[in-house]
Structure formats: structure tokens, C-alpha cells
């Protein structure tokens, strides 16, 4: 046995000195100091104060829960192309759009099936309480987005700096656009959530995860989101020289995801289907294209971005130049070689990607709010860069960085809250009225004089139907409940009920009649008003094909009535008082009508 003795002595063995600091912890801290961030050299560590995981998670969770419960559904595509097929998977019935006809097959059942996995668990736990199942699915979507937000936030703190990460997560938390998009059941929202993961993986140089996220977003979500993989592709191929790794990883991941998707979709459609290719061909190459569903000027996106991001949208365009200015200032003493500017490459590539997305979708005639969802993470990121770089370039010298940053975020949060409340106040009743319908059908005990099945009808408000999750399967006496359409001024193609069958694949493989991809009206979709037991309508003056139920008191009586904005008469201050809630002024200048649930008077 070897002992340690004093040099030149024969005394007792020396004990090692007490360990005050754990060596592994010290080594980890040492390594941490050596990490260079965007603006921080090795000898100048980023000692800014960070948000803790707990505080970020709690803030995000509270907002995403609120969005799942109170966020409206502002896109009929979400209902009829996603909620209704999911309802079919869970309860055996729902509405079918032409996109799910095996003739066209431009939607993916694999995407629906991913949501069916947690949804089936909720349905088993809560039985026929379908609104609870609906809310829990939205919350699950929100949680998936939440984890991506935190992953991106953590990567920004590690690779850019803590202040930028802090601003980024605050913008993401308070954004009214994120409030709605984070719990929406549409592929563009799915791609938006994955963009957070892409951003985090890219900054962390986790190439395999980044490629997987881009591939999954592109193939399962929306094929156009392949654009979001531009930074990873350019960095790996042009800057890092990882060509073989990129090609092999992309092939393996693409074949795995594509294989599972093709097998799943082909099973449900009854023929070989690659849905991402079909939707690309329809929109870009051979199909009639989305312009059948309306065209908007470029100002549509400008207004939309302002409504959803208010003052942040003015800061975001300056994120790249201001960040570049401060980066150059910090590193100007170094040799300006290619390696130095490669450190700034992620900012350049992310800026190019954002600009490319805006250019592609801004140039399309058909524009929708959800088309911008996938770049929401980049908007928050570049606005955070702009605010942080402004502080570093000039405000710190004036001693005003903290004050102005707090004021900026406070102003953003107030405007976002104003926008979110305005949306709920003006349009929220189209969901709440169906909660009233659900309560009416669930609590009522006498349905003797009702039709069998009991029929709920909608006319001009067909596009605001929140899905069959709000319609009970049966009532107390066992009668089924169904929703149908009555004629309105709308002249396009409405969805039709899926085929009724005990076997799901028989339903999904069935080729429905009276379907087309030209948005041409099919009269067979309509039922006679006399066959309806309930009607949900927004009360407006009568037109040729739209009755005013308020004046039909002998036949229809209101069960519940909730305020709903009359957009055509609420144009004060160019619609700003409709877009944002301003105490007293919004109530003064906006004109409200009512969204009403009517029941036949003799029932």
C-alpha cells in the first residue's frame, strides 16, 4: 500500500485536503466560460440573468391552457379537414371534404392518426363528453408547441445570448397570434410548432434532429415547409462540409417517414397515395389551385402581421442589420476571415429563410392568415435580436436599456391582450353558442316531438361550425343528433357526411358522389328548413336565400343569444377598434348583433 508522507520525514500519512468545490462542477463551469456566443468572446462570458425552467414553463403553460379553452376557431378548413376526420376516427361519423375523396387524396390520414393516438385515450376516459375531449386535444397540441418554444429559447440562450432568449420567449408568450396558432389543429400550426424545434436544433448544431424535424414537417405537415430547412441544408452542405452525412441522414429519415406515411394513407384510401406530392401538384402544377377560394392583396398579410404581432413586427425587420452591426463591433479587432463570419451565418441563413417565405406566399393570389404561422418563431427571434442589439449599441450607454426594454415588452403585451380579448369578445360566441346547444341537448329530457334523428341546421354560418365534437351523439331517449346545411348566399361546395359503416376503411375508401375540386355548388347538400329542430344563426337582415329568424317568432324561438360583431358596420378608425379592444371606444364604434340558437316553437 502506497502512502503519502512529508518530504524528508517519516510522520503519519497526510489526509487529502477537504474538497470545498466539486471538481466536476468546477470543470463544467470552466468549459462553460470557454463557450463563445454570438457577441461574447471566451474571456467575456454572458453573465446576464436567465429565466428559470420553472418560470418559463409556468408562463407558457398558463397561456397555452387559456388558448385551448378560450381560443376561437377562425378557419373552416381546420374544422372540416381536420376535426371532422378525427371525429370520424373516434366516433364513426363526421363531414367529408373533396380533399379526402380517394379521387383526389390531397390530405393525409397519417396526420389525423397522429392526433388520434392521444385523442382515443381522452375519448376512453371521458366517454361521450366530447367537448372535454376536444379541449384536451387542443391542449395536447399546445403542449407540443410549448416544448418546442422552450427548446428554441434554451438554444438561443446558449448560442446567441441570454437577453435575446429572454426577449424571444416573452414575445412568444404574449403574442396574440401565438395564442390562437399554438392550439390550432391545422398543418400550418403543426409546422409552426416544429419550426421551434428546427430553430433549436439548428442553433445547437444537432443536425440529425434538425433534418428529422424538417422532413417530418414537410411530409406529414405541409410540403411547402421544406423552405424552413434552408439554413440546415446550406450550413451542412456549404459551410460545414457535411455533404455525405446530410445526404445519408436525409435519405434514411425521408424513407422512414415517407414509408410509414405512404403505408398509412394507402391503407385508408385504398390505393397508393403520397399526400404531400398530391397537394403540391394541386397547388402548383396541375390542379385548379387555391385561388378558387378567394384572392387578397399584399396588404392582407401586412394587416394580419400587425394585428397578431403589433409593435414587434416593426422591430423584426431590423433584427438582422442591428445584430450584424453589433457583431462587427464586437469582433472587429479580430482578423476578418471567413471563419469569423461563419459565426454569423445562422443569422444570415435564418433571415434569408424568413424573407423567402414571405416572398413565396406574398406573391400568391390566395392568402390566408395560417400561411404565415410557420414563420412566427422567426418573427419572435428577429424582434428579440433587434431589441437586444439596440440595447447593446446605444441604450446601455445612455443607461436606458432596462427601462425601454420593459416599456417595449409591456406595450407589446398590452396590445396583444387587447387583440386577444377583442377576438374573443367579437367572435367567441360562435363557439359558446354550440356549448349552449350541447347543454340543451344533454339536459333536456323530453324529445317526443322532435325528428329522429334530431336535426341541427346552419345556413350562412356553416363556416363557423366548431365541429361535431360540440354535437352529442345521442340524447336522453336514445335519438341520434345530426347537423345539416340549409341554403344561404354561399354558392360554393359544402362538405357532406362520410359514408356510414361499422368499418372505418370502408368509409375512407368509399368514393363519394357529388364531389368536385372546382368549388362548384352541389344542391344536394341542403335540407329543407322544415326538417330542422334547431337552427344556429347570426342575426342579420333577410336576403333572398337567408331568412331573418328574429322575424319568424311563430315558427322559431330563441333558446340562447350571445353578442356577435357586425363587421360591415364596425369600421371605426379603419377597423382598428374592431381589431383591438379599446375600453369605451370599441363599445362606442363597433356594432354588435347576436349569434342565436333557435328551436322550433312547437317543441
From Swiss-Prot:
A biological process from GO: protein N-linked glycosylation
Highest taxon above the source species: Eukaryota
GO-annotated molecular function: alpha-1,2-mannosyltransferase activity; dol-P-Man:Man(6)GlcNAc(2)-PP-Dol alpha-1,2-mannosyltransferase activity; dol-P-Man:Man(8)GlcNAc(2)-PP-Dol alpha-1,2-mannosyltransferase activity
GO cellular component, one term: endoplasmic reticulum membrane
Residue ranges annotated as Lumenal topological domain: 1-108, 152-166, 217-218, 267-310, 365-370, 419-603
Bilayer-crossing regions: 109-129, 131-151, 167-187, 196-216, 219-239, 246-266, 311-331, 344-364, 371-391, 398-418
Keywords, comma-separated and alphabetical: Endoplasmic reticulum, Glycoprotein, Glycosyltransferase, Membrane, Transferase, Transmembrane, Transmembrane helix
InterPro entries registered for this protein in UniProt: GPI_mannosylTrfase
Pfam families with a match to the protein in the record: Glyco_transf_22
Disulfide bonds: none
Membrane topology, from the record: Multi-pass membrane protein
Subcellular location as annotated: Endoplasmic reticulum membrane
Uppermost EC category: transferase
Region: Disordered, residue numbers: 1-25
Pathway: Protein modification; protein glycosylation
Its biological purpose: Catalyzes the transfer of mannose from Dol-P-Man to lipid-linked oligosaccharides.
Family: Belongs to the glycosyltransferase 22 family.
Protein name: Alpha-1,2-mannosyltransferase algn-9
Origin organism lineage: Eukaryota, Metazoa, Ecdysozoa, Nematoda, Chromadorea
Amino acid at each position: 500500500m502506497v502512502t503519502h508522507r512529508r518530504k524528508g520525514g517519516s510522520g503519519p500519512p497526510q489526509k487529502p485536503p477537504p474538497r470545498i468545490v466539486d471538481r466536476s462542477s468546477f470543470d463544467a463551469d470552466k468549459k462553460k466560460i470557454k463557450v463563445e456566443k454570438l457577441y461574447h468572446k471566451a474571456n467575456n462570458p454572458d453573465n446576464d440573468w436567465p429565466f428559470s425552467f420553472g418560470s418559463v414553463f409556468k408562463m407558457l403553460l398558463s397561456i397555452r391552457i387559456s388558448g385551448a379553452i378560450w381560443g376561437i376557431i377562425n378557419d373552416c378548413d381546420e374544422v372540416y379537414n381536420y376535426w371532422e376526420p378525427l371525429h370520424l376516427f373516434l366516433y364513426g361519423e363526421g363531414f367529408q371534404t373533396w380533399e379526402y375523396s380517394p379521387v383526389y387524396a390531397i390530405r393525409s390520414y397519417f396526420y389525423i392518426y397522429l392526433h388520434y393516438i392521444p385523442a382515443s385515450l381522452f375519448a376512453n376516459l371521458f366517454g361521450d363528453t366530447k367537448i372535454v375531449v376536444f379541449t384536451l386535444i387542443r391542449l395536447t397540441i399546445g403542449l407540443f408547441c410549448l416544448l418546442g418554444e422552450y427548446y428554441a429559447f434554451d438554444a438561443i440562450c446558449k448560442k446567441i445570448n441570454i437577453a435575446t432568449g429572454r426577449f424571444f420567449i416573452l414575445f412568444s408568450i404574449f403574442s396574440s397570434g401565438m395564442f390562437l396558432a399554438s392550439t390550432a389543429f391545422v398543418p400550418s400550426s403543426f409546422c409552426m410548432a416544429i419550426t421551434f424545434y428546427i430553430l433549436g436544433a439548428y442553433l445547437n448544431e444537432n443536425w440529425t434532429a434538425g433534418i428529422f424535424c424538417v422532413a417530418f414537417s414537410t411530409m406529414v405537415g405541409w410540403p411547402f415547409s421544406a423552405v424552413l430547412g434552408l439554413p440546415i441544408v446550406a450550413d451542412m452542405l456549404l459551410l460545414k462540409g457535411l455533404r455525405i452525412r446530410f445526404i445519408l441522414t436525409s435519405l434514411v429519415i425521408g424513407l422512414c417517414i415517407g414509408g410509414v406515411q405512404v403505408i398509412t394513407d394507402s391503407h385508408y384510401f385504398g390505393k397508393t397515395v403520397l399526400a404531400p406530392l398530391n397537394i403540391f401538384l394541386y397547388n402548383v402544377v396541375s390542379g385548379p389551385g387555391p385561388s378558387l377560394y378567394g384572392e387578397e392583396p399584399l396588404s392582407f398579410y401586412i394587416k394580419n402581421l400587425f394585428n397578431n404581432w403589433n409593435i414587434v413586427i416593426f422591430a423584426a425587420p431590423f433584427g438582422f442589420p442591428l445584430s450584424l452591426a453589433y457583431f462587427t463591433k464586437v469582433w472587429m479587432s479580430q482578423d476578418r476571415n471567413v471563419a469569423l463570419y461563419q459565426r454569423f451565418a445562422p443569422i444570415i441563413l435564418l433571415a434569408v429563410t424568413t424573407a423567402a417565405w414571405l416572398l413565396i406566399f406574398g406573391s400568391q393570389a390566395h392568402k390566408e392568415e395560417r400561411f404565415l404561422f410557420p414563420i412566427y418563431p422567426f418573427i419572435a427571434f428577429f424582434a428579440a435580436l433587434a431589441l437586444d442589439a439596440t440595447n447593446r449599441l446605444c441604450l446601455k450607454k445612455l443607461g436606458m436599456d432596462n427601462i425601454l426594454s420593459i416599456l417595449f415588452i409591456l406595450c407589446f403585451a398590452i396590445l396583444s391582450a387587447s387583440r386577444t380579448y377583442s377576438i374573443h369578445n367579437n367572435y367567441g360566441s360562435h363557439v359558446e353558442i354550440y356549448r349552449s346547444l350541447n347543454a340543451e341537448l344533454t339536459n333536456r329530457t323530453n324529445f317526443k316531438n322532435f325528428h329522429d334523428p334530431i336535426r341541427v341546421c346552419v345556413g350562412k354560418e356553416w363556416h363557423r361550425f366548431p365541429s361535431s365534437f360540440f354535437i352529442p351523439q345521442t340524447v336522453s331517449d336514445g335519438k341520434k343528433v345530426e347537423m345539416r346545411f340549409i341554403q344561404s348566399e354561399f354558392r360554393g361546395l359544402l362538405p357532406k357526411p362520410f359514408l356510414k359503416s361499422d368499418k372505418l376503411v370502408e368509409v375512407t375508401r368509399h368514393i363519394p358522389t357529388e364531389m368536385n375540386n372546382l368549388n362548384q355548388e352541389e344542391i344536394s347538400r341542403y335540407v329543407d328548413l322544415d326538417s330542422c329542430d334547431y337552427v344556429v344563426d347570426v342575426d342579420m337582415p333577410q336576403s333572398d336565400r337567408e331568412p331573418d329568424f328574429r322575424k319568424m317568432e311563430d315558427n322559431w324561438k330563441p333558446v340562447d343569444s350571445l353578442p356577435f360583431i357586425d363587421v360591415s358596420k364596425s369600421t371605426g378608425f379603419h377597423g382598428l377598434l374592431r381589431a383591438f379592444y379599446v375600453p369605451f371606444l370599441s363599445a362606442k364604434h363597433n356594432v354588435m348583433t347576436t349569434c342565436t340558437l333557435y328551436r322550433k316553437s312547437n317543441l
